[in-house]
């Protein structure tokens, strides 16, 4: 499957569909069946239950020898609790090497303080989850394919976002650089709120779209959310100024705000207006480099149409990973896992999903 054939819609969690009745669990356990606790199961019920439990155990199997070898090969730089020195302290029952801090006395492993801390599912399951993201699967289809609980996909995605924050820092394009802004509609509730405010003031409706500044030099790219209003000179310079090398050639559509970037970086300007390029074939369009990225970005975000706009930059960081770095998907998985092992980020499940507003 490719990203072109994996477009689906995931329902956005809302106060209405997330409402929890008192005393009733929010989500059904994968090991819970309508006939659980009843005597005399039918043959069909027994077969279904045995199959699902087998799936469950497969997803929660013990780490493979290769996974244990990988984890035990990671050498912590310091105690994740206090930053002190440490010594080896044998192995845990799972086979993972344990360490003990010489200063605070706490014990830990190479995974302590990372997104894999206190994991219940083998790290190897992340490979399939990441591949689904790279192939433009929605969270809903990924949860179904992986037989995960409804919140698992969102919980893991929050971990992916945490690891990728800052991944675009330091990206600088040079040579021939194409730029343009991509617009995403605000959700219906935000549009209605913006309309009410504009009607009260008697002006134009604003704040109904999110702007993303995009750039590419044909090899690398960047995607930076500028806000809910059309970026002016200051916002353009903030988005593009640190990400384009001086004296490069800027290929753009003549947007007025681009002039601030051109002047500040002494760029050569090559303008192709929308009137000029309208109706052109892709191979003839001088802005095809940036238009192609916009097209892929649109398809990617459409696969996750229920996303929270407050996390739009996180989604752009994930899209950056898809369109930059190693071309091979397995190399991207390797790249991500190695980043995750090295970053001390811990996100507790209880903090994300433990409390539901009534």
List where the protein language model places each region.
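Residue-level recognition of single "structural anchor" positions
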Residues: 2-358
């Amino acid at each position: 499957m490719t990203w072109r054939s994996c477009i689906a819609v995931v329902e956005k969690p809302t106060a209405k569909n997330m409402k929890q009745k008192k005393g009733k669990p929010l989500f059904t356990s994968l090991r819970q069946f309508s006939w659980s606790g009843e005597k005399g199961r039918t043959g069909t019920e027994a077969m279904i239950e045995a199959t699902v439990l087998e799936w469950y155990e497969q997803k929660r199997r013990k780490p493979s020898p290769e996974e244990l070898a990988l984890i035990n090969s990671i050498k912590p730089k310091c105690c994740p609790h206090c930053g002190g020195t440490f010594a080896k302290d044998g192995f845990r029952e799972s086979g993972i090497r344990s360490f003990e801090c010489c200063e605070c006395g706490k014990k830990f492993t190479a995974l302590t303080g990372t997104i894999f801390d206190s994991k219940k599912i083998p790290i190897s399951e992340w490979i399939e989850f990441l591949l689904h993201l790279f192939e433009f699967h929605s969270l809903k289809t990924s949860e179904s394919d992986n037989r995960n609980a409804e919140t698992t996909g969102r919980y893991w995605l929050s971990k992916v976002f945490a690891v990728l924050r800052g991944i675009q820092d330091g990206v600088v394009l040079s040579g021939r650089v194409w730029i343009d802004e991509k617009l995403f509609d605000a959700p219906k509730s935000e549009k209605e709120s913006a309309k009410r405010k504009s009607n009260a003031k008697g002006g134009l409706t604003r704040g109904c779209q999110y702007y993303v500044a995009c750039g590419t030099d044909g090899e690398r790219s960047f995607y930076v959310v500028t806000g809910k209003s059309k970026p002016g000179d200051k916002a353009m310079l903030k988005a593009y100024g640190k990400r384009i090398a001086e004296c490069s050639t800027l290929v753009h559509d003549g947007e007025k705000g681009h002039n601030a970037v051109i002047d500040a970086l002494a760029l050569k300007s090559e303008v192709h207006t929308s009137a000029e390029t309208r109706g052109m074939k892709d191979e003839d369009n001088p802005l095809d480099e940036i238009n192609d990225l916009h097209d892929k970005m649109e398809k990617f975000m459409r696969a996750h149409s229920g996303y929270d706009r407050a996390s739009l930059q996180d989604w752009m960081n994930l899209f950056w990973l898809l369109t930059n770095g190693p071309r091979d998907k397995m190399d991207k998985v390797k790249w991500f896992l190695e980043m995750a092992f090295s970053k001390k980020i811990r996100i507790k499940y209880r903090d994300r999903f433990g409390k539901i507003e009534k």
